[in-house]
């Protein structure tokens, strides 16, 4: 799992590096495009994912002390918050589409959709992994699932300021 996590972090790192490299060529255009984003909903999504990471870590601690039922509840809480993240992100995409904003609108939005879409796919994969782990709840399995989930959290904590806040 660690090889997968490190390789995924490298892929996201390359995407962020490309975003920042292209941003240097058109800072005004990127800033103008960025004004179309909802910083508040992205901030809420940040809180949602960090909280879900807490529940994933709690699940490991609970399972390690023999409390499997509570551990499963913590995993389902992390999964539910992952679903909340995806609902908010989908709303954001639908709203952008309604404004006619696509990957072709500006290079900023090409990167926005690619990076956040790839991340959303990882959130979905993480929800599936946490679901599988909940059925085979051992400390080792939960630790593995939580490690992937924390990678998803970490990526968002990097994407959020770079895409939504950095000017």
What are these model-predicted stretches?
Residues 1-167:
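...captures the hydrophobic TM-helix bundle architecture rather than a specific catalytic motif
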């Amino acid at each position: 799992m660690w090889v997968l996590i490190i390789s995924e972090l490298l892929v996201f790192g390359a995407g962020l590096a490309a975003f920042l490299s292209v941003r240097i060529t058109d800072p005004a255009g990127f800033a103008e495009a960025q004004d179309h984003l909802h910083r508040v909903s992205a901030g809420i999504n940040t809180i949602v994912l960090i909280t879900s990471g807490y529940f994933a870590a709690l699940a490991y601690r609970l399972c390690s002390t023999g409390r499997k039922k509570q551990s499963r509840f913590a995993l389902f809480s992390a999964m539910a918050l992952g679903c909340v993240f995806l609902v908010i992100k989908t709303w954001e995409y639908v709203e952008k589409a309604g404004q006619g904003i696509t990957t072709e609108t500006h290079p900023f939005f090409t990167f926005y959709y690619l990076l956040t879409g790839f991340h959303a796919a990882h959130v979905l994969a993480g929800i599936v992994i946490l679901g599988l782990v909940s059925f085979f709840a051992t400390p080792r399995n939960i630790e593995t699932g939580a490690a992937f989930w924390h990678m998803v959290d970490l990526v968002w904590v990097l994407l959020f300021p770079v895409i939504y806040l950095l000017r």
